[in-house]
Amino acid sequence: MSTEKDYVVADIGLADFGRKEITIAETEMPGLMSCRTEFGQAKPLKGARITGSLHMTIQTAVLIETLVALGAEVRWASCNIFSTQDHAAAAIAAAGVPVFAIKGESLEDYWVYTDKIFQWADGGLSNMILDDGGDATMYILLGARAEAGEDVLSHPHSEEEEILFAQIKKRLAASPGWFTKQRDAIKGVTEETTTGVNRLYQLSQKGLLPFPAINVNDSVTKSKFDNKYGCKESLVDGIRRGTDVMMAGKVAVVCGYGDVGKGSAASLSGAGARVKVTEADPICALQAAMDGYEVVLLEDVVSSADIFITTTGNKDVIRIDHMRQMKDMAIVGNIGHFDNEIEVAALRNLKWTNVKPQVDLIEFPKGNRIILLSEGRLLNLGNATGHPSFVMSASFTNQTLAQIELFTKPDQYSNQVYILPKHLDEKVARLHLDKLGVKLTQLSEEQAAYIGVSPKGPFKSDHYRY
């Protein structure tokens, strides 16, 4: 482990390897490269001090270097203990960006690193957060509430909360008043994923959101592409790398049929699996049925299916009672943000055999075993390398534009959750068309007037559902 200077990575010697893969990724990320061309000279993020908490992958490296090219100072950690690509982290550290991320880091280290991305060398404060899942945002807000005298650190509900609270208490003791100062210095947060967005909306509804936020997840060019087409490619990749199991003919159960569930079902179906879906939402259930999937109760298929994947963003979707009933060597994994979709904590007193990194064999008293991928965390990033560069370019271009919006136009945003305007969503899509050889039909003035739009767009109303 390298700890010199202002970074923590597994092996700085991997930097050259990481740089080669970053160079390849740049050719697959036209949106981000276009941002460098368009905004590089003006440097709209000059003066921005961005704390980034997002999977430290090769694709994220391209995002980080785009933010730097636009004038920002950046400090970065991964938002998941298993999702870091160590060569990507090394390349970014070698380029001079403080990064704190190691694949397989402990939960204790995870929260130490989350603290470090707010600790600038000159003692200054971050003024922007780029978040994925909301952990960086919640770290600051919880600490500020504790400083205000609220009893928010006394009753942890999980091992992770216990570790988080301990880290907050450590910072409270070392730097009294720091959390409140840091909270008040934030101009805005841009949030990448469904789970983090839900956290922000809950804060906003309670009047507890202390700065503006942009919900990047619900940009069409994020949720309908990253969540769907990204999962369509990366889910099966993770299962294959983790297990080498043939999926053709297997029965796979996808829990949830939102955008991530849709992509996951398509991924497994494309690999030849016979896919069944569980859903609580009647609209999503109807979509699944009309897409040709049998919509079932988990309890009715738990003893017969071969593969189980959670995609919901909810907790306790697959519980210990379900896993006890699974057939021998059933594969269990999650592609939602947090590890509590599967009741992993309830498995800890059973016999675990580690097969290889992020693949564990868990044996029940009756003798049946399950294969658990990435300890219930994101298997596409834990067991593989996540979504392909091209689809992440769309997501990260949204992130870049959102950071520019909040940093350069603070007077236009109050302490609410916003979505990027439609013209920027369409811009992100346009930036990715040439790479695929797409040619757009041009509406005439008469055609545009007939449907009530500008010939140059936006082409859909804000409430249109793609």
Swiss-Prot record:
Enzyme kind, highest EC tier: hydrolase
Reaction it catalyzes: S-adenosyl-L-homocysteine + H2O = L-homocysteine + adenosine
Gene Ontology CC: one annotated term: cytosol
UniProt-annotated location(s): Cytoplasm
GO molecular function, one term: adenosylhomocysteinase activity
Keyword NAD: yes
Protein name as it appears in the record: Adenosylhomocysteinase
Source organism per UniProt: Rhizobium leguminosarum bv. trifolii (strain WSM2304)
